C-alpha cells in the first residue's frame, strides 16, 4: 500500500485495508515507525511499509535488521483478477507488479507467500488511475467479506503456518467455485505469474 490519508481507500491499498481491519477487529494498534508501521505479536510481526508500494523492499530490508524473520506473507491488490477473488501461493516472479519486484530484490522467491485480492479492471481508465482510485460503495459490498476472510487467513498463518492458510483457502475455493453472483469466482491455476 501507500502511506497517507489521500491513499487510504484506494484500490491499491487493499493490503493495508486488510491489515487495518484485522487490527481493528482484534483491538490491536499499529506502532508508527519511520520506514513502516508495525505490530509485534508472539509469533509474527505485521508491517505496513511507508516507502510507497514500488519501494516496499526497502521496508522489508529494514525489518530484517530488527527481527529474525524467516518468511513473509504479503497481501496485495491485483488488477488482473476479477473483483473480490483471491489467489494464494508461494514463490514465483513479480508478474509485472513493481511492489513485488521490489520485495524480490531483497527476498528469495520461496520466502515470499502471497495473498492476492482481485480489484478488477476498468478498461475506460488507465491502470494507474484505476488502482489509485477509491474503492466504490458497490465494490466494498463485494470486498468486505473477502477482507474478513483474509483476516482469517492471517490468523491461521500466525497461529499455525502457511499450510493452514492453503488448507482453508482450498475449502473456501470449493465452497464458492463458480459462484459469480457473489463475486467469489474460484481462481485459476495458482502457479501462474500471469496477471500478478
Language model regions located:
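Nucleotide and nucleotide-moiety/phosphate-recognizing core
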Residues: 2-91, 101-115, 122-126, 141-188, ...
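Hydrophobic alpha-helical segments within soluble ligand-binding/sensing domains
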Residues: 96-99
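Short glycine-enriched, charge-decorated loop/helix-capping segments at active-site entrances
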Residues: 87-93, 131-135
Amino acid at each position: 500500500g501507500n502511506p497517507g490519508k489521500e491513499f487510504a481507500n484506494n484500490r491499491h491499498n487493499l493490503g493495508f485495508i486488510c491489515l487495518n481491519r484485522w487490527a481493528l477487529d482484534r483491538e490491536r494498534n499499529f506502532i508508527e515507525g519511520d520506514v513502516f508501521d508495525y505490530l509485534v505479536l508472539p509469533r509474527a510481526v505485521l508491517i505496513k511499509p511507508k516507502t510507497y508500494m514500488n519501494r516496499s523492499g526497502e521496508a522489508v530490508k529494514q525489518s530484517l535488521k530488527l527481527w529474525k524473520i524467516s518468511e513473509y506473507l504479503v497481501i496485495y491488490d491485483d488488477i488482473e483478477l476479477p473483483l473480490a477473488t483471491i489467489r494464494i501461493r508461494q514463490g514465483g516472479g513479480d508478474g509485472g507488479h513493481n511492489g513485488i519486484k521490489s520485495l524480490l530484490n531483497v527476498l528469495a522467491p520461496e520466502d515470499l507467500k502471497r495473498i492476492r485480492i482481485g480489484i478488477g479492471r476498468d478498461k475506460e481508465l488507465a491502470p494507474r488511475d484505476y488502482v489509485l482510485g477509491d474503492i466504490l460503495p458497490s465494490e466494498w459490498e463485494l470486498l468486505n467479506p473477502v477482507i474478513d476472510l483474509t483476516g482469517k487467513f492471517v490468523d491461521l498463518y500466525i497461529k499455525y503456518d502457511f499450510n493452514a492458510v492453503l488448507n482453508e483457502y482450498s475449502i473456501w475455493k470449493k465452497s464458492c467455485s463458480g459462484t459469480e453472483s457473489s463475486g467469489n469466482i474460484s481462481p485459476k491455476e495458482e502457479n501462474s505469474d500471469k496477471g500478478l
